[in-house]
From Swiss-Prot:
UniProt entry tagged with the keyword Ribonucleoprotein: yes
Coiled coil: none
Gene Ontology cellular component terms for the protein in this record: cytosolic large ribosomal subunit
Entry-linked HAMAP family: Ribosomal_uL6_B (MF_01365_B)
Function field: This protein binds to the 23S rRNA, and is important in its secondary structure. It is located near the subunit interface in the base of the L7/L12 stalk, and near the tRNA binding site of the peptidyltransferase center.
Gene3D superfamilies according to UniProt: Ribosomal protein L6, alpha-beta domain
Gene: rplF
Species of origin: Chlorobium luteolum (strain DSM 273 / BCRC 81028 / 2530) (Pelodictyon luteolum)
Protein name in the entry: Large ribosomal subunit protein uL6
Length: 179
């Protein structure tokens, strides 16, 4: 039995879960999320909790058990509280600003980089060196954060670039001067 899969998920009174035609739909105060479902697992709702159960004991069913438990858990958390990723920009002259619905990044290239957020993602810049990405879909928030980070990954010698909040960049020593 999957240690993660067998744990019940508390719904709370804000979220509502529905399974119809092989699609899981979770509705909450922040929005609605859908997820296609595989045949190897089923979702049972009882007294304010959701249980993900597997149909048989095949290798694929065991793999899907824990996966779908976490997918449903993330959907419930997304529609009730949402997800946020914070990016920090380090480097002289590196900055970010919002221009209407575009994120304008100055990252030491000869041109500015403009990034438009996909549907369901909200971006804001509280200051010039911080970008906040928020939304209800955890995977999409992480994907957008990774895309923005890929424009200028942190380099190990000076630490310049875009990094996640709390990310530790392993620093390297530069070339030693010869005798």
């Amino acid at each position: 039995m999957s240690r993660i899969g067998k744990m019940p998920i508390a719904i709370g009174n804000e979220a509502k879960i529905e399974v119809k035609g092989g699609i899981i739909t979770v509705t909450g105060p922040k929005g609605v999320l859908d997820q296609p479902m595989v045949e190897e697992v089923r979702i049972v709702e009882e007294d304010g909790k959701v249980l993900v159960q597997r149909i048989n004991d095949s290798k694929r069913a065991r793999a899907m058990h824990g996966l779908y438990r976490m997918l449903v858990s993330n959907m419930i958390q997304g529609v009730t509280t949402g997800f946020t990723r914070k990016l920090e920009i380090a480097g002289v002259g590196f900055r970010a600003e919002m221009k209407s619905d575009l994120l304008a990044l100055t990252l030491g290239y000869s041109h500015m980089i403009y990034f438009k957020a996909p549907e369901g993602i909200k971006m804001e810049t509280p200051d010039q060196v911080t970008v906040l990405i928020s939304g209800i879909d955890k995977a999409l928030v992480g994907q957008v954060a990774a895309k923005i980070r890929s424009f200028r990954k942190p380099e190990p010698y000076r630490g310049k670039g875009i990094k996640y909040e709390g990310e530790i960049i392993r620093r390297k020593e530069g070339k030693a001067a010869g005798k």
